Amino acid sequence: TLDGKGGFWLASEGNTAKMVPHGLLHVNAKGEIKEQIGLPPELAANEVRFGFEGVAKVGDMLWMAVQREWRDDPKGMVKLVAYNTETGEWGAVHYPLEPKGAGWMGLSEITVAGDHAYVIERDNQIGAAAVVKKIFRVKLADLAPAKLGGDLPVVAKEEVRDLIPDLKATGGYVVDKVEGFAIDAAGEGFVVTDNDGVDDSSGETLFFSIGKVE
């Protein structure tokens, strides 16, 4: 996400087993890393491999979507984590996932436009087994982060679009990883999928418009 000063904030999904930390990276316009911010102890103590899947900026606050439940989350709840770039304070809210069927349910993106934060929520299934590939939104006014280590408020979500009809439109199978969403200055929404390489799939990647996001 843009930092408002010509650079970018990036979310790094780590893997402790491979000695790759979760965290935030602040880079300049050339992509040079100028600052690295690791997780605070309250988050690090409960992390799992499925970490930050997107970052969005609202004023001085960065919001990150955590893909799946961490060890301190109630079942069916994932964190939207907040980091204040001016004060260095961390916080979070809980986001309620859709009921889980086969596989797992999680978040794959967060982006901000107007008065809302938009997230992609999906299962990890393909083809006929895929049930949830959706865009939801949360009111920015409801994103009031609580202190880590205690009870977190649960935000209300509103469904914006079911993406499965879009994913079926090409006549192929429904792909798994819907992982990117952006809204341009005219209000048009764009979605992109991640093929994770081509070793065990067709390698198909989709990039498409969902039209005006009202």
What are these regions (language model features)?
Residues 1-214:
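Sequence/structural signature of beta-propeller domains
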